[in-house]
Amino acid sequence: MYHADLHTHTIHSDGEYTPAHLGLMALQSGIRYLAYTDHNYSYSPAELSDLRLQFPMLRILRGCEFSCFYRTADQRRVEIHIVGLNFDPDCPEFQAVLRRNQPDRRSYVTKILNKLDALGVGIGTYEDLMAFCNGPQHLGRMHIARSLVTHGYVKTVDEAFDIYIGSFGQRLAYVESELDYAPIEDVLSALQKAQGIAILAHLFFYPLDDAEQHRLLRTFKALAGPCSGMEVYYGRYTDEQRCHLAALAAQYDLLPSAGSDFHGPGDGNATHDGGLGHHFPASVYEALEARQREVYGVVHD
């Protein structure tokens, strides 16, 4: 039986593995449909062509996880993530959003590092963190979490988020994002113009109560149009959470999507052995692609 994973990360953003290594893991895990969805990064045609030549048994999909901002009813600014699939990478509106979503992260990351240092759990400077992570294009909290593990302050990446840098939990060194990402309206408009699939990622990760979750879903559906979905099958979610998300997806006419959000073996979204072996049904992707063909008459490679 084939499987799908439509939400993964590599060293192009905050993942631990190269795209080729991730492709090999997917192949060994029985995955048929694999989307590389690095943060605010679009793979070049040459990169995808090389990966498809290496892994002809995989259906490798063009993807990107967009950061964007959403305004709540009380005008709070909440960072939301949207997975885009099978879009036209040459669409001018898409390119404009991608350029907008490349802010300088030094100030934001440095503020977190300074808070950690004040707590006595210092992991060095911005330059030290860059060196530790081998100069990634997208330096962020996942890299800080791994450094906290390496320095022995916490045992796992999840513990680093729960105690220090996550949006929930103790938030001892949490810093509100100041990065100037595009608003949700611009991201979803760009994905429609690029004839892509828009998927609302990990609904339970956002600091929203039930009423605001429903408001976000209504807004997302209205802006995303018919070629849209939301993550129902997700790495760390329980069966009960998935059932709840499936009901919400049906209520708002959003197709269910499936993604591990895999970053590496120390990630809470990895399988028990640190791998990429979540058995999400391939039919989930096939339904998304069928909707894209119905709406746009094309599936972009």
Task: Pin down the residues of each PLM region.
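Active-site gating loops and adjacent loop-to-helix segments of metal-dependent hydrolytic enzymes
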Residues: T72-D104, R146-L172, D273-Y296
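Divalent metal-binding pocket/active-site signature
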Residues: G15-E16, R106-N114, G122-A211
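Intrinsically disordered, low-complexity regions
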Residues: Q28, A118-G120, D273
